[in-house]
């Protein structure tokens, strides 16, 4: 993966807190042009650092009131790809992970209520060839949801401050003219 610099990290730090922030504001905060921000964001997307942008829908607002994690044990780990293909046909499943530990995989799904959850478990998940056991954990409350830390180092912060100081000096010099 291509290296990202301190400006890239600053941009990421800003846009991960507010994906709708205008590039003009990001540019002002970073001390560079709007075009530079646009080019940087596009490059970060092209190299796979930024993997998407969009709106997040509150599942409860659509009637999905039960957030559930299900640990799944497969007959054989080699059945993982087959099971994932089956899971892709179940719209309530929003995440799937191949794991170490007591389960072969863990999925996250949303159900309307406990009856809907039971229907999904008994009539959909446990009917898939290769699934031999499930263990269900219902989330009572999501306490934290955030992105991974961008990790601006002291060196990165100093570089950004230097950029800002240089920009401010240019603005001041031009104002005096």
Task: State what each model feature region is.
Residues 1-177:
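A compositional/biophysical signature of low hydrophobicity enriched in polar/charged and small residues
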């Amino acid at each position: 993966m291509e290296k990202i610099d301190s400006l890239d990290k600053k941009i990421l730090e800003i846009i991960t807190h507010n994906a709708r922030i205008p590039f003009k504001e990001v540019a002002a905060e970073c001390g560079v042009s709007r075009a530079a921000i646009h080019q940087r964001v596009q490059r970060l997307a092209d190299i796979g650092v930024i993997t998407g942008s969009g709106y997040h829908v509150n599942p409860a607002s659509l009637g999905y009131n039960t957030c559930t994690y299900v640990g799944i044990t497969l007959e054989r780990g080699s059945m993982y790809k087959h099971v994932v293909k089956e899971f892709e046909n179940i719209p309530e499943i929003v995440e799937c992970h191949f794991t170490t530990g007591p389960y072969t995989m863990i999925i996250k799904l949303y159900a309307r209520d406990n009856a809907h959850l039971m229907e999904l478990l008994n009539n959909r998940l446990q009917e898939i060839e290769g699934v031999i056991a499930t263990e269900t954990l219902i989330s009572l409350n999501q306490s934290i949801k955030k992105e991974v830390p961008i990790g601006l180092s002291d060196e990165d912060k100093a570089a950004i401050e230097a950029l800002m100081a240089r920009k401010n000096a240019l603005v001041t010099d031009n104002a005096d003219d």
